[in-house]
């Protein structure tokens, strides 16, 4: 009898939560729509959020600009989009993808764990907008149509598909004296595949999602060095949820970090080893110093947030205390 009572109580409690749940719209950008990884991760997130009294209606978008426009016109309570798009609404969280700032997934886990804690809320909750969740979609790698383009010097003069709203990437391409070919998420893959550009950059999932193997052909390759750690971030108007719900959302999203990383690793491991190009340590050192100089310049231009740059430098130096940057006078 007691077991029956407990079961009935649990069932009634579940119905009570469902009955009083507040319905909100979560608009998700995923290039593959409802079949994509990001959409399905966020479907699971929505299930987990029901315990907080929020019932999300999750809607897929294959055009990121449309998803952002619908959010700004209040058709969506929350939008899930790349940090590169969301940086203008929260420079702190957008700095997670700063060039070369997070060289490994171990360090990325530490960064995201730190940002999910309550102490970070003051940086993520703004007067108008808030970030209520972040999850990884993988390191951005250079896809090159010639695998011998593996040093900084060899990139000079090459045509690089560059997202037209990504100020740090435009700065970097100009810095190495390459040619910016303005692009967006919908067409960068096509430009690489038809030879309009020599180089593009993206996480590993794009290899199949955008069929980048067509652009790699027989001589191309993927430089096995993370340019940046790309994430999907959940943006909402601060007054949409109370502070406790916003924080719980961030914690729930981070609790799914392993799930997201398993997908990232699945995509990276699915790419034939013949495409990967490993750098010499001397070239890695050049990339790291070049990225560091760019981050300092972009901090001065107020594109990157100095507080998060410092946090990420401390995490890097904890992982590699002998790195030259850790003792420099101009360290981040």
Task: Give the positions of each predicted feature.
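Short, glycine-/small- and polar/acidic-enriched structural segments
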Residues: 23-140, 205, 214, 222-227
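Glycine- and acidic-residue-rich phosphate-binding/metal-coordinating active-site segment common to enzymes
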Residues: 179-218, 223-224, 230
């Amino acid at each position: 009898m007691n077991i029956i009572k407990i079961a009935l109580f649990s069932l009634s409690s579940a119905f009570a939560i469902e009955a009083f749940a507040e319905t909100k719209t979560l608009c998700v950008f995923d290039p593959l729509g409802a079949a994509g990884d990001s959409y399905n991760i966020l479907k699971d997130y929505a299930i987990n959020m029901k315990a907080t009294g929020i019932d999300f209606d999750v809607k897929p978008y294959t055009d990121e600009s449309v998803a952002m426009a619908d959010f700004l016109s209040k058709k969506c309570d929350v939008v899930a989009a790349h940090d590169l798009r969301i940086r203008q609404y929260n420079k702190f969280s957008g700095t997670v993808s700063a060039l070369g700032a997070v060289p490994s997934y171990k360090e990325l886990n530490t960064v995201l764990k730190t940002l999910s804690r309550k102490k970070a809320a003051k940086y993520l909750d703004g007067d108008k907008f808030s970030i209520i969740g972040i999850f990884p979609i993988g390191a951005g790698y250079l896809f090159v149509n010639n695998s011998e383009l593996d040093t900084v010097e060899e990139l000079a003069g090459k045509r690089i598909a560059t997202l037209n709203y990504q100020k740090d990437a435009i700065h970097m391409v100009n810095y190495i004296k390459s040619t910016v070919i303005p692009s967006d998420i919908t067409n960068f893959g096509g430009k690489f595949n038809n030879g309009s550009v020599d180089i593009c950059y993206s996480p590993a999932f794009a290899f199949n999602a955008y069929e980048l193997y067509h652009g790699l052909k027989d001589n191309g390759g993927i430089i096995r060095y993370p340019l940046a750690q790309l994430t999907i971030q959940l943006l909402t108007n601060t007054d949409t949820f109370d502070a406790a719900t916003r924080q719980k959302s961030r914690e729930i999203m981070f609790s799914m970090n392993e799930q997201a990383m398993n997908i990232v690793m699945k995509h990276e491991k699915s790419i034939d080893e013949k495409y990967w190009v490993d750098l010499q340590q001397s070239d890695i050192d050049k990339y790291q110093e070049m990225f560091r100089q760019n981050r300092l310049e972009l901090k001065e231009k107020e594109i990157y947030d100095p507080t998060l740059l410092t946090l990420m430098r401390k995490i890097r130096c904890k992982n590699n205390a002998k790195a030259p940057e850790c003792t420099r006078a101009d360290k981040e």
